[in-house]
From Swiss-Prot:
It catalyses: alpha-D-glucosamine 1-phosphate = D-glucosamine 6-phosphate. InterPro entries: A-D-PHexomutase_a/b/a-I, A-D-PHexomutase_a/b/a-I/II/III, A-D-PHexomutase_a/b/a-II, A-D-PHexomutase_a/b/a-III, A-D-PHexomutase_C, A-D-PHexomutase_C_sf, A-D-PHexomutase_CS, Alpha-D-phosphohexomutase_SF. Its cofactor is Mg(2+). The gene is glmM. The lineage of its organism: Bacteria, Pseudomonadati, Pseudomonadota, Alphaproteobacteria, Sphingomonadales. This is Phosphoglucosamine mutase.
């Protein structure tokens, strides 16, 4: 059994920055300005002129939050570079490329438009450590050190941010790579990649059909994108496309659709890209980093290729930490977060998509034959809500868990973890016998309900 504890309680930062419903709780202009002031003070070190890169997705509230962040950063003496709508990995890239002290992405990823979030990146383009976020939290609740009028920062928009990122995307595949033979449906979720992803794929030669490229401030992730696949599945089949590419609101995750309209998740994509990298002696670390939620089938497949699967707790930040400490250059999540460290410092759905398209072209085979690299082991996840207490500490629940492990008899996996944001226990089991998997999950869920 793999069981996670709850994260250390923090007032502002969660597992992926600060996130919430706009104009409530921590997601207000006032809090955004204080975050900017605290982060600006923290990163305002050295004698050089300090700067921050700010990008956003297409949410209506993005303009409001951007203005608050600009006010906060400039008030503590930092210059601001505004990119406009741009994917999260592009903001991370430009932060490093433009020698900025800090990068900020305004996005709530795959959440509906009512939510928004603030993600921070250090000068190296990587997300901040827990220690740095805690230091910034302390600054948020302290009095800001406002600078004299003559030292207030300046703000400017750069017009070529999209072009810079498109160039970097094309550099992530070989110079000989062309997609002339492919007809590709690209779904950008009416989000941050609505201009850059179709352009990059088209510039590499593909015929493209676009979905989710008409953002209006309120339609991000609404019936389109990697969490709403009906439209792209239907379009791929109706248009006779070779493949579909579905991104989420900030384009840090990817789900692929084969020519038959079947979805291909992050586990299959990781398996495909990792084996192609291994064939070219480009894979580092001897395998792939994924979370405890990745399918056992991926682990068995990699093992058959003499590669290993290193597991972490859920969250792409934990995947990235293990990649950095273990020398890996590919990792991700079943949900579609894909980190290719040779080309990006955070999850980048478009970079991963280009790798998938290159593999498809080089194979000369249909996507349905190329993308489904392993047989999935039956897997079931259920969420159980509870009221008060700690149900996982109850003897009755521990007995149910022990019975489940005994029933699986080493031929499956059991993952039980509390949610870090709500009173929910997540129960996942997988094994070769689908009926047995369902039985053990239901038994544990019943025990949690009774204990709660």
């Amino acid at each position: 059994m793999s069981q996670q504890g709850q994260a250390v309680a923090r007032k502002f930062f969660g597992t992926d920055g600060i996130r919430g419903e706009t104009n409530t709780g921590n997601m207000t202009p006032e809090i955004a300005m204080r975050v900017a002031q605290a982060a600006g003070e923290y990163f305002r070190r050295g004698d050089h002129r300090h700067r921050v890169v700010i990008g956003k997705d297409t949410r209506l509230s993005g303009y409001m939050m951007e203005a608050a962040l600009v006010a906060g950063f400039t008030s503590v003496g930092m210059d601001v570079i505004q990119t406009g709508p741009l994917p999260t990995p592009a903001v991370a890239l430009l932060t490093k490329e433009m020698r900025a002290d800090l990068g900020v992405m305004i996005s709530a990823s795959h959440n509906p438009y009512r939510d928004n979030g603030i993600k921070l990146f250090g000068p190296d383009g990587f997300k901040l450590s827990d220690e740095t976020e805690l230091a910034i939290e302390q600054g948020i609740v302290s009095e800001p050190a406002l600078v004299p009028a003559a030292e207030i920062g300046r703000a400017r928009r750069i017009e070529d941010s999209r072009g810079r990122y498109i160039h970097a995307l094309k550099q992530s595949v070989s110079d000989e790579t062309r997609f002339d033979s492919l007809k590709v449906v690209v779904d950008c979720a009416n989000g941050a990649a609505y201009q850059v992803a179709p352009s990059a794929i088209w510039e590499l030669g593909a015929e493209i059909i676009t979905l989710g490229v008409t953002p209006n401030g309120t339609n991000i992730n609404d019936g389109v994108g990697s969490t709403s696949l009906d439209a792209i599945k239907r379009t791929v089949v109706e248009e006779g496309a070779d493949i579909g590419i579905a991104l989420d609101g900030d384009a840090d995750r990817l789900i692929v659709i084969d020519e038959k309209g079947e979805a291909v998740d992050g586990d299959q994509i990781m398996g495909l890209i990792a084996t192609r990298m291994a064939e070219k002696q480009a894979l580092r670390g001897g395998g792939v980093v994924a979370t405890v939620m990745s399918n056992l089938g991926l682990e068995r497949y990699l093992d058959s290729k003499n590669l290993r699967l290193e597991r972490t707790q859920v969250g792409d930040r934990y995947v990235l930490e293990r990649m950095k400490t273990g020398g890996f250059n590919i990792g991700g999540e079943q949900s579609g977060h894909m980190i290719l460290l040779d080309h990006a410092t955070t999850g980048d759905g478009t970079v991963a998509a280009l790798r998938v398209l290159a593999s498809l072209v080089n194979s000369g085979k249909p996507a349905s034959e190329v993308l489904h690299v392993f047989e999935k082991v039956p897997q079931l996840l259920k969420n159980v809500r509870y009221e008060g207490g700690r149900p996982l500490d109850k003897d009755s629940v521990q007995t149910a868990i022990a019975d489940a492990e005994k029933a699986l008899d080493g031929k499956g996996r059991l993952v039980i973890r509390p949610s870090g944001t709500e009173p929910v226990i997540r129960v996942m089991a997988e094994g070769d016998d689908a009926d047995q998997v369902e039985t053990v999950v239901d038994q544990i869920c019943d025990a949690v309900k009774a204990a709660g």
